[in-house]
Curated annotation (Swiss-Prot):
GO CC, one annotated term: nucleoplasm
Domain RRM stretches: 10-87
UniProt-listed PANTHER family: RNA BINDING MOTIF RBM PROTEIN -RELATED, SPLICING REGULATOR RBM11
Protein name: Splicing regulator RBM11
Keywords: Developmental protein, Differentiation, mRNA processing, mRNA splicing, Nucleus, RNA-binding
Domain of life of the organism encoding this protein: Eukaryota
Region (Disordered) residue spans: 172-238
MF annotations from Gene Ontology: poly(U) RNA binding; protein homodimerization activity
Location(s) in or outside the cell: Nucleus, Nucleoplasm; Nucleus speckle
Signal peptide per UniProt: none
Function statement: Tissue-specific splicing factor with potential implication in the regulation of alternative splicing during neuron and germ cell differentiation. Antagonizes SRSF1-mediated BCL-X splicing. May affect the choice of alternative 5' splice sites by binding to specific sequences in exons and antagonizing the SR protein SRSF1.
Gene: Rbm11
Organism encoding this protein: Mus musculus
């Protein structure tokens, strides 16, 4: 077999590509089907990428598997078209028969899986890389309303339960439905303690300054009286 024919049998045609698709994205995507040797994204005379390209595998068996695995998946919202390359020995084969041919090629490995007790058709694993994801995905992740949207959370906002009234000096949230404050405004209010034993103590504490003032006034009166007595004694002496 000629080298050109051999390379054509190891290459797939990838069409209907979006303008933002790069060769690195195609490499990460088609690497799931097998090892690659070359990824080419066709460009026009101005250097702008066209809507198709070619992916060359290391083994020809990977071509049928890549068509069965990746044909029709969406890149940037557009389904890609994966076919045999024109000029290959299997280019006339319809795309819907690629899965059957892939099953025939890998029938030996499937039989070994059945002997080992594993399922005959293993589920392929699709690793998601940052290069294969559109930029809009990361843009919406960074938006604050994306992670804290009230629609995604429980009904509106669940406020924390207020502290029990038995705790002295506790505070609670009261809803104020005023037109200026808005329908969802809250204000802090101080709740007096419900323990009746605390009030006499406060009264006693308040009475202490009064008694002190009374004693000070009595002392003043006593001083004034003593001064008057001294004046009277002086007058009697004279």
């Amino acid at each position: 077999m000629f080298p050109a024919q051999e390379e054509a049998d190891r290459t797939v045609f990838v069409g209907n590509l979006e303008a933002r698709v790069r060769e690195e994205i195609l490499y990460e995507l088609f690497l799931q089907a097998g090892p690659l040797t070359k990824v080419t994204l066709c460009k026009d005379r101005d250097g702008k990428p066209k809507s198709f390209g070619f992916v060359c595998f290391k083994h020809p068996e990977s071509v049928s598997y890549a068509i069965a695995l990746l044909n029709g998946i969406r890149l940037y919202g557009r389904p890609i078209n994966v076919q045999y390359r024109f000029g290959s020995s299997r280019s006339s084969e319809p795309a819907n028969q690629s899965f059957e041919s892939c099953a025939k090629i890998n029938s030996h490995s499937f039989r070994n899986d059945e002997m080992a007790g594993r399922p005959s058709f293993p589920v392929p694993f699709f690793p998601i890389t940052s290069a294969a994801l559109p930029q809009e995905y990361f843009f919406f992740q960074k938006m604050p309303w994306y992670a804290h949207s009230p629609v995604l959370q429980p009904p509106f906002c669940e406020m924390p339960a207020p502290l029990p009234n038995s705790v002295p000096g506790s505070c609670a949230l009261n809803h104020s439905p005023g037109p200026e404050a808005g329908p969802s405004s809250y204000e802090w209010t101080h709740q007096p303690p419900s323990d009746p034993d605390l009030y006499p103590r406060n009264k006693r504490k308040r009475q202490r300054p009064d008694s002190d003032s009374d004693s000070s006034s009595e002392d003043k009166r006593g001083n004034e009286g003593s001064q008057k007595c001294r004046k009277c004694k002086k007058k009697k002496r004279y």
